[in-house]
Amino acid sequence: MKLRGLYAITDSQLLDDGRLLPYVEAALRGGARLLQYRDKSSDQARRLREAESLRELCERYGAQLIVNDDAELAARLGVGLHLGQTDGSLSAARALLGRQAIIGATCHAQLELAEQAVAEGASYVAFGRFFNSSTKPGAPAASVELLDQARPRLPLPITAIGGISLDTAPGLIARGVDLVAVIHALFAAASAAEVERRARAFSALFEPA
């Protein structure tokens, strides 16, 4: 599948109390192309259960599930993987998951990390945070000028993450970003209907003018 569009990322605090599946389905209905399951808890049985349910939803809507920082879970479910800089070897994950798996890499604000990820077999690279982030307030800041440098040098899709909203996403897309990764601006909503509305609005930003 072409890696372009809205990249929805779950948050276990935002999506508690039974909201995970209905809110995720709303995001997929609204056009999210990738969904990252991000849950840092140690409850492996629950994580497996939730990830299996999310995989079924993604298959239904033609989207791709990406698991955050758990190569074994990704391999068990036959889905993609996203690795941070401290989440283990990208080349080892590629060997485990195979050539066809989608594997993304966090590169913060460093073009050198992105070039290394390309060499190790990444499917996409992620830069950020570009704006103030509720999820990772202490993450290194990235500038939009980084995108100007990265686009001609990287042969892979570029993901932007970090405090992205409907107001700020267009400027990033105009600079060559292929995927906008969104958490709060998508899922911090009062209803599933509102999540779907926001997802449709983000997805529309990628449509030809």
Curated annotation (Swiss-Prot):
A GO cellular component entry from the record: cytoplasm
Residues involved in Mg(2+) binding: 69, 87
Co-factor binding comment: Binds 1 Mg(2+) ion per subunit.
Residues reported in the UniProt entry to bind 2-[(2R,5Z)-2-carboxy-4-methylthiazol-5(2H)-ylidene]ethyl phosphate: 133-135, 163
Known EC number: 2.5.1.3
GO BP annotation list: thiamine biosynthetic process; thiamine diphosphate biosynthetic process
Pathway note: Cofactor biosynthesis; thiamine diphosphate biosynthesis; thiamine phosphate from 4-amino-2-methyl-5-diphosphomethylpyrimidine and 4-methyl-5-(2-phosphoethyl)-thiazole: step 1/1
Residues bound to 4-amino-2-methyl-5-(diphosphooxymethyl)pyrimidine: 36-40, 68, 106, 136
Cofactor entry: Mg(2+)
Molecular function GO labels: magnesium ion binding; thiamine-phosphate diphosphorylase activity
Domain of life, source organism: Bacteria
Class of this enzyme: transferase
Reaction catalyzed: 2-[(2R,5Z)-2-carboxy-4-methylthiazol-5(2H)-ylidene]ethyl phosphate + 4-amino-2-methyl-5-(diphosphooxymethyl)pyrimidine + 2 H(+) = thiamine phosphate + CO2 + diphosphate; 2-(2-carboxy-4-methylthiazol-5-yl)ethyl phosphate + 4-amino-2-methyl-5-(diphosphooxymethyl)pyrimidine + 2 H(+) = thiamine phosphate + CO2 + diphosphate; 4-methyl-5-(2-phosphooxyethyl)-thiazole + 4-amino-2-methyl-5-(diphosphooxymethyl)pyrimidine + H(+) = thiamine phosphate + diphosphate
Keywords: Magnesium, Metal-binding, Thiamine biosynthesis, Transferase
Family label: Belongs to the thiamine-phosphate synthase family.
Reported function: Condenses 4-methyl-5-(beta-hydroxyethyl)thiazole monophosphate (THZ-P) and 2-methyl-4-amino-5-hydroxymethyl pyrimidine pyrophosphate (HMP-PP) to form thiamine monophosphate (TMP).
Record protein name field: Thiamine-phosphate synthase
Organism: Pseudomonas aeruginosa (strain LESB58)
Gene (name only): thiE
